[in-house]
Amino acid sequence: MFARMSDLHVLLLMVLAGKTAFGLSLLSFLTEPDPDWTPDQYEYSQEYNNQEENASSTTAYSDNPDWYYEEDDPCLSNPCTHGGDCLVSGATFTCRCPDPFSGNRCQNVQNKCKNNPCGRGDCLITQSPPYHRCACKHPYRGSDCSRVVPVCRPNPCQNGGTCSRQRRRSKFTCACPDQFKGKLCEIGPDDCYVDDGYSYRGRVSKTIHQHTCLYWNSHLLLQEKYNMFMEDAEAHGIGEHNFCRNPDGDKKPWCFIKVNNVKVKWEYCDVPACSALDVANPEGRPTEPLTKFPEFGSCGRTEIAEKKVKRIFGGFKSTAGKHPWQASLQTSLRLTVSTPQGHYCGGALIHPCWVLTAAHCTEIKTKYLKVVLGDQDLTKTEFHEQSFGVQKIFKYSHYIEIDDIPYNDIALLKLKPVDGHCALESKYVKTVCLPDGPFLSGTECYISGWGVTETGEGSRHLLDAKVKLISNTICNSRQLYDHSIDDNMICAGNLQKPGQDSCQGDSGGPLTCEKDGTSYIYGIVSWGLECGKRPGVYTQVTKFLTWIKATMEKEASF
């Protein structure tokens, strides 16, 4: 029923195993008294019984604060970039770099274009042999762009454009159909940018002064901060093309251009901003509400100031209302001998009637399932709680488990209205926003939950912890998940200090990242190995936005 019941620990609460975990938490108890903090019963019953052993743990930690990290494998965090292999060499490491990369961490890109002129084209660096190629200007062809082909055969004009030859054999023009433009009629009527264009993924490759953009993998850009070989290039929409992008959050999309055949500079692009109508209703659909139940005034905003309270097993006891979209999935069934009725998975409220969770949390029939919102202490019924039955479960159709690893691990729960309404907005119950684009590796995000999974106990209080997003390249290294992470998954944790941040969430609970003061659900707690030692693995919500919205809209029509 659950993912990896044996050796796969789905983000368990226990962060540092055994007595040593207690040594870390007890020290903070003694040095930072907090009159508002109430310890968990679980904490007392499981960790406070053997005072002699606990005292010795504390002493060991005090004498050597780096005790936990002394024998860390230097390759654990895979410091080698660009798919390099990390080799342990005594107390340090060396990186074995694939072509065309070099450097002590494979951070440099070798310029394979130095002795390979492209004539009527631009030389590009590639990641496959011979690690360079020529991007020829039409109508030139060949490995060095020296051969000329007929300019209009085959027709280079796209989207039904008509090609006309000019006097010079290499010159031509495209007569574009209505609403299409560009040298090859490649730019459609919907090619525009929203806000500052950070999420722009169109095909404009001309600047406002009509200069042609350089390819992002041009050899001329190897020394630039932004190119195809930068970390998270794909998340920025940067690849082996020369389309305008805005990776640094400038005021609009831009690109690099070549000046005097040598010098590189940048210019803003000739791409229009989308009109207000396009932004509000990009597909021209009737602007009907999603359901008959009104949505909340806003999403992803809290009314609670962050308050740092006593650390509990590597996480923090969360302030009530700090994660108002947090949902507790509870069942009236006893799932296993060690798991009683009650809370068993987490979720996130994305609409008054909809909760997002993991597919592997939805093997229970709706009649045995309820969702509690605004919950802080699982042992109490609090005044700000709202409880709902589940009307329907929508599991993603391609969800599957292979070798105990859940793929496409996402599901939607449609809540059953109470007294004619679903969730009511309050300080303690709010919706989290769906993301409109990717977040970068290294972004600090939150996981939250009670730390309860199907194989162990957790805290009675809602916990949270900060984690950092980790690129799939690093997460797929041999030292971590060895190519088990697919494009619909993301990793998050703390590679420098493992053990303090990977186990506070519940299966199905939210990984939320913030932008401009608004929280977005970027991941769903899915699975992991060696809890506290490797990053947690999450379903990447941006990969399923179309399915989420289509499912909710379809149900709204009933």
From Swiss-Prot:
Residues 71-107, 109-146, 148-186 form the EGF-like domain. InterPro entries: EGF-like_Ca-bd_dom (IPR001881), EGF-like_dom (IPR000742), Kringle (IPR000001), Kringle-like (IPR013806), Kringle_CS (IPR018056), Kringle_sf (IPR038178), Peptidase_S1_PA (IPR009003), Peptidase_S1_PA_chymotrypsin (IPR043504). The active site is at residues 360, 409, 507. One of its GO terms (biological process) is proteolysis. Transmembrane segments: none annotated. CDD domains: EGF_CA, KR, Tryp_SPc. SMART domains: EGF, EGF_CA, KR, Tryp_SPc. Proteolytic cleavage at Gly-23 or Leu-27 can give rise to the 50 kDa heavy chain (HC) and cleavage at Arg-311 or Lys-317 can give rise to the 27 kDa light chain (LC). The HC can undergo further proteolytic cleavage giving rise to a 26 kDa fragment. The LC can undergo further proteolytic cleavage at Arg-311 leading to a 17-kDa fragment and at Arg-478 leading to a 8-kDa fragment. The record marks 478-479 as: Cleavage. Residues 312-553 form the Peptidase S1 domain. Disulfide bonds join 75-86, 80-95, 97-106, 113-123, 118-134, 136-145, 152-163, 157-174, 176-185, 192-274, 213-255, 244-269, 299-433, 345-361, 353-422, 445-513, 475-491, 503-531. Its EC number is 3.4.21.-. Its main location: secreted. Heterodimer; disulfide-linked. Heterodimer of a 50 kDa heavy and a 27 kDa light chain linked by a disulfide bond. PANTHER family: HYALURONAN-BINDING PROTEIN 2, TRYPSIN-RELATED. Cleaves the alpha-chain at multiple sites and the beta-chain between 'Lys-53' and 'Lys-54' but not the gamma-chain of fibrinogen and therefore does not initiate the formation of the fibrin clot and does not cause the fibrinolysis directly. It does not cleave (activate) prothrombin and plasminogen but converts the inactive single chain urinary plasminogen activator (pro-urokinase) to the active two chain form. Activates coagulation factor VII. May function as a tumor suppressor negatively regulating cell proliferation and cell migration. Belongs to the peptidase S1 family. This is Factor VII-activating protease. It comes from Bos taurus (Bovine).
